[in-house]
Each structure stands twice: as C-alpha cells, then as structure tokens.
Amino acid sequence: QSVSADLTTFVEGRKLDDDASIMIRLNNGAKGSLSISQVATGEENNFTVAIYGDKGALKWSQENPNYATFSQVGEPSQIITRGGSIKVEGTEANVRIPAGHPEGYLEAFAQIYSDAADVIQNKENKEELLKLLPNIDDGLHIMKFINASVNSSNNHSTWTDLSTIK
C-alpha cells in the first residue's frame, strides 16, 4: 500500500544507493520493514528473511540455507532442517540435492527456469505452475515499489502510496 524509505550512498563515487531502510504498510493492515545494505561491516552476503506475527515467527538466512527457525509464543524455538521430520506439502518436487548439502539462491532461480520450461512445453500442471511464476503484473508492482521508495527518500522519507505511482 505505502512505503517510507531512506536511501543512502555511503561509498563515495558510487552511482547507486548502497544502503536502504524501508518501512512498509500493507493493504491488510500488516506492517513490515526492509533493511538492505552493501556496506554492513562484518556481513558477507547475508540475505535473511524474518516474518514476525502475533502467534510466532519464522526466520531463514541464505548463509545457513539448510536451517530455518520457527518460534511460537510460549514455546521453545524449533530449528527446521531440510530433510528433517517437518515436511511441507508440495516442496519435495523442488528439492534438487540430498539433505545436508546447501541449497538456496542458485537453485531458486533454477526452479523458476524449470517451471517456466514446463509451462512452455505445456506440461499437465501448467495452471498450477503459472501461479508460482513471476509475471508482468509482479514486475510492474516491484517497479512501483522501487519508484515509490525513491520518491519517498527524495521527499524526506514521507509516506508514499504505491497507487500514486504511474
């Protein structure tokens, strides 16, 4: 729905922002935040996704791709591992290598390419695969998000509604 962004270039001479803090308001009332940096001291190429809710949290990091942490209020946190006892329906077909070997960033793109090839070849589950693949509307929405973030940052981080972005 809307964003408030602070984009900064810390490295002199760099043409693009190398650090961003973005607050997000979603249509359903949920809120989120993004912290993105190419200049975070001590980090290598850390990509972490954390989702926090009123009943629990889920956290995954690219630097440890075989593990996710699941926490429920009032319960000890659980480490979920690839190939462990917790199975997620529909994911087995997307696993390319045995448990214990890291799987993540490159395999995610490989899965998109594989699903797109299946759609092009008219496989039986084409409609289901199309729901998982990024499409032009997804791309337009991401471009609106980026433009709204730049506009917000250029206007002292004022909240910017994505619907105002053309």
Regions found by a protein language model. Give the residues of each.
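C-terminal helix-rich "cap/oligomerization" subdomain common to oxidoreductases
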Residues: Q111-K166
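A residue-level signal for beta-strand positions that form part of recognition/binding surfaces
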Residues: T48, A57, W159
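Rossmann-like dinucleotide-binding domain that binds NAD(P)(H)
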Residues: Q1-E43, D137
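C-terminal glycine/acidic-rich active-site capping loop/insertion
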Residues: Q1-L7, S21-L26, K55-L133
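Short linear motifs in exposed loops
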Residues: S35, S61-Q62, L162-S163
